[in-house]
Amino acid sequence: MAQTMLLTANAKVDLRSKESLVERLKPKPLSSFFLPSLPLKYPSASASASSHFTSTTVALFKSKAKAPAKKVVPKPKEKVEDGIFGTSGGIGFTKQNELFVGRVAMIGFAASLLGEAITGKGILAQLNLETGIPIYEAEPLLLFFILFNLLGAIGALEDRGKFIDDPAPPTGLDKAVIPPGKGFKSALGLSEGGPLFEFTKANELFVGRLAQLGIAFSIIGEIITGKGALAQLNFETGVPINEIEPLLLFNIVFFFVAAINPGTGKFVTDEEEE
């Protein structure tokens, strides 16, 4: 009987040791490492408490979110335009084309004034005298010529490009003295190899527009009155032509020189600026 009780006791001890070993081998929750284990009377309650316990992780330092990179939108480049119609090509003349037309108009207007001073006939009568073509047969061409000059004079045919003046020469007292090896033009502030009158191409363009207006209105006036430009001037002002001969000669010479004189500056188009 005593042996049986001893074996039973030993068996109980072994069972307890086995149970404690099984308990040790069971996976424990993470909270058991950070929180002290509390002795609970009922293991089922501790298991349920550990199953309901949740741990929240709070980050002390958060990585700063990067701001999205700004997209740089290239600014659209403005076109070099100066015309009334703004056609950007099409029927639009460049300023260089209009400059050529203005030079032709200056030569034509000066020649018509000189011819009227010699022959006493207007530009249309001179055309009839030189070619023998009656004016009424050339009316369509004449109307086109008048319209073309009027539109060109107000800048309606050109819209592309611009003239850029050359940089101004330096000024000062040191520039008032003629430097060694330089001529008299450099003392006046003029470029040695440049034109004498220092006309810019923009100035020449303006004078060409005036010549276009002069030709157009002299033709219109001659169609209406039958008189040339000088006779119209005499009719409007009452001043005899012989009294304004110096002014007339100056205008003729001025238009001729302005037409053949190369202006300073340069012509820039849209493609060259890009």
From Swiss-Prot:
Gene3D superfamilies registered for this protein in UniProt: Chlorophyll a/b binding protein domain
Compartments (UniProt record): Plastid, Chloroplast thylakoid membrane
The entry's keywords: Chloroplast, Membrane, Photosynthesis, Photosystem II, Plastid, Repeat, Thylakoid, Transit peptide, Transmembrane, Transmembrane helix
Topological relation to the membrane, as annotated: Multi-pass membrane protein
Record field: transmembrane: 104-124, 138-158, 205-225, 240-260
Pfam families tied to this protein: Chloroa_b-bind
GO cellular component terms listed in the entry, alphabetical order: chloroplast thylakoid membrane; photosystem II
Transit peptide: 1-66
InterPro entries linked to this entry: Chloroa_b-bind
Sequence repeats: 61-166, 167-274
Gene Ontology biological process: photosynthesis
Similarity comment: family membership: Belongs to the ELIP/psbS family.
Annotated function: Seems to be involved in non-photochemical quenching, a process maintains the balance between dissipation and utilization of light energy to minimize generation of oxidizing molecules, thereby protecting the plant against photo-oxidative damage.
Name assigned to this protein: Photosystem II 22 kDa protein, chloroplastic
Gene that this sequence comes from: PSBS
